Amino acid sequence: AYGKDNNIYKFVTQLEIVGNEKRIPDGIVYINGLPLVVFEFKSAIREEATIFDAFKQLTVRYRRDIPELFKYNAFCIISDGINNKAGSFFAPYEFFYAWRRVAGLAKEVDGIDSMFTLTQGMFHKNRLRDIIRNFIYIPDSSKKNEKIVCRYPQYYAARALYENIKKAQKPEGDGKGGTYFGATGCGKSFTMLYLTRLLMKSEYFKSPTIVLITDRTDLDDQLSAQFVNAKTFIGDNTVESVESRADLRDKLQGRQSGGVFLTTIHKFTEDTELLTDRSNVICISDEAHRSQVNLDQKIKLSEKGVKKTFGFAKYLHDSLPNATYVGFTGTPIDATL
């Protein structure tokens, strides 16, 4: 999945750097001579020194005295050997997170074990270059310095869904790309964004069209604002909220590839007319358990006679029959997709 690695990696400790003042960062990871990761360590046994002090050292003193070091910085690590966290140079302290898992490990770890998962997980060479390439989001228009580094659940989820979509794509696959269950606050919208980038940048998919469906308009506004502000990151200038079903049909039929379209599930009801039968369409549905469970037919009796209605999923699958479907949910449920 990662391709050939011709990069040169060096880990340098205690390098004196002279800027406005002389500073000596504890560790720097150089890739091809570029200082991409800076480490700051504190002692676990000295009670007065915490990793918050390491954070301040990086973001106050180093920023003031050796700002040149951070021109190429991807992210930073603060650690006392027991508490080990990664974060963007511009992020507040509470947005530094532990990397608690490596591929193949059954459970998440904490404490001293999280140093192992950080080095084996985040700093596995293939994963490190994947993170630098695909999992650091810089918004298109940002008034302040803003850079968002993925957290480990977002990384592993986006990668797993990407591989699953590959297998599920029609005609060879069954179109079921899988469901991601993420607890509230896990940064689900970023997982969607990272997944979208992987799909759009992938040589395998050759610029697919992505339809992002939510079932709440308030969330849709938040999500669409985030996506519309990520055109550079996604790699496609067409990232649009769709006003109506007819609007979506026009947009889908006017292209053979590319484009990210955000819509709400309610725009799909009452009509099962084909939107497109292309198989290079990936449908990402938020709160999947609510919107897609009911393929069932319902019958309503009215003065005009019997009227058949269907659950949202029926409309969806009839409208995009060859798409691959991926669901995101905060509530585990058996019948998603």
Where are these regions (language model features)?
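A short beta-strand-to-loop transition that corresponds to the Sensor-1 phosphate-sensing loop
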Residues: G81-I82, R216, T263-K267, E287, ...
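Conserved helicase motor
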Residues: T217, V239-R249, I265-E270
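ATP-dependent helicase/translocase motor core
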Residues: A1-T209, D218-I234, Q256-V260, D296-I299
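Hydrophobic alpha-helical scaffolding
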Residues: K147-R151, G185-C186, I213, T217, ...
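Signature of the SF2 helicase/ATPase Hel1-core->accessory helical subdomain module
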Residues: I51, Y97, E270, T276-L337
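Conserved motor-coupling elements within RecA-like helicase/translocase cores
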Residues: E243-F261, L274-R278
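Structural beta-sheet core signal
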Residues: V38, C76-I78, L212, C283, ...
